[in-house]
Amino acid sequence: MKNIIFMGTPSYATCILKELIDKGFNVQALFTQSDKPVGRKQILTPSDTKKFVLENNLNIEIFTPKSLKDENIINEIKILKPDFIVVAAYGKILPKEILDIAPCINLHASLLPKYRGASPIQSAILNGDKISGVCTMLMEEGLDSGAILESTECDIEGKNSAEVFIMFSNLAAKLTISTLLNFEKIIPKKQDESLVIHCKKIKKEDGLITLDNASEIYQKFLAFYPWPGIFFENGMKFLDIELIDSEKTQKSGVILQVEKESFLLSCKKGILKIKTLQESGKKVLDAKTYLNGKRLKLGDSLF
């Protein structure tokens, strides 16, 4: 039985942690982010992985260090003598002192060297990639730059971030087990630095849209679901849309067709079907109800 130290924070990591336990690995310790204030009442809430360990009364020691460079933390890890350190969306950089203790295997939600960084799923969707996947990587000091151990790919076309997140969680869980069981036989493959694409952390303002390009708006809608969503300068949000045409050029913002519960809206390039929307500070409405309330009709401008 292999001894594992697991480092991870969100539900993506919990899926992997659960699989490790189910497959009989000895998870000695969980390293995760500190409890964070959540919601209007700012209630101090544990990470998803910590919550999983506590709710299931698992005999796994939990660490929430502010820094992994703390000598006491490094010594704690050395004392445990892990066979592997498995890292999945932990949120902290591992210093060389920890990388040298045992093989550190990172689960990354892209087919590296594409999308190194904090938003690989959203970036793949934004760029309209039809295929993406997850990989296991032997960690080094650089950001997502280590040698690839194994990878698995799948079709993400037309799927939003929430859907891909669930798919990748399951793929990553299975891939983790495969990599650990076959580690001695796997030949690590260096990443091709000429193919590197970096991706940044998503901010709320990334969801801002204008009616220029229907295809780009639709990819943003998929990539930024459920957060930050897509919205206009005036605060209006499009909550459910479809891409109808990506090429036709015309005046933007015109209601081209009114349907039972939706309407077609022109962009400078392309056409969108608007199904559900929400004005700033108002309740969510289906598109037809919104038009009726505003007394908007075929040929009118939405704004």
From Swiss-Prot:
Annotated InterPro entries: Fmt (IPR005794), Formyl_trans_C (IPR005793), Formyl_transf_N (IPR002376), Formyl_transf_N_sf (IPR036477), Formyl_transferase-like_C_sf (IPR011034), GART_AS (IPR001555), Met-tRNA-FMT_C (IPR044135), Met-tRNA-FMT_N (IPR041711)
The protein, known as: Methionyl-tRNA formyltransferase
NCBIfam families noted in UniProt: fmt
GO MF entry, a single one: methionyl-tRNA formyltransferase activity
Root EC class: transferase
Family the entry assigns: Belongs to the Fmt family.
Domain of life: Bacteria
UniProt gene name: fmt
The organism of origin for this protein: Campylobacter lari (strain RM2100 / D67 / ATCC BAA-1060)
